[in-house]
Amino acid sequence: MLFSLLELVQWLGFAQLEIFLHIWALLVFTVLLALKADGFAPDMSWWNIFIPFFTADGLSTYFTTIVTVRLFQDGEKRQAVLRLFWILTILSLKFVFEMLLCQKLVEQSRELWFGLIMSPVFILLQLLMIRACRVN
């Protein structure tokens, strides 16, 4: 079951550019992960492998700020605030998950159990289910 680009834009709340940006980050992350797993880049740290995700989150936040300012200037304040809160909630949960996962991979500490690491993803999935029900 594949979604069209229009459905992804409606459900996620991201613009097409932001979706492309996150797909690009996933592609670069996958290449870096494969290089580390195959031993071609053994000295590369996990923080360096996660840089594409961090960069995509930062650029998406910057894009959201620009769109919010433009919506405020056009007089669509309610839509601007709702979009800002939604996107920042998604990006912050995604960022917390990435940081916790990267910290677990680097340190291998027992204090970071996988239930704690996955909790932002579970919250994000619940929010996406609620948004999917509201969109349709």
Swiss-Prot record:
Signal peptide: none annotated. It comes from the Eukaryota. GO terms for cellular component: endoplasmic reticulum; endoplasmic reticulum membrane; endoplasmic reticulum-Golgi intermediate compartment. The keyword Protein transport does not apply. Pfam families: Tmemb_185A. InterPro entries: TM_Fragile-X-F-assoc. It is found in: Endoplasmic reticulum membrane; Endoplasmic reticulum-Golgi intermediate compartment. CDD domains: TMEM203. The chain crosses the membrane at residues 14-34, 50-72, 81-101, 112-132. It is a multi-pass membrane protein. Keywords: Endoplasmic reticulum, Membrane, Transmembrane, Transmembrane helix. Its main location: endoplasmic reticulum. Involved in the regulation of cellular calcium homeotasis. May act as a regulator of STING-mediated inflammatory signaling in macrophages. This is Transmembrane protein 203. It comes from Xenopus tropicalis. The gene is tmem203.
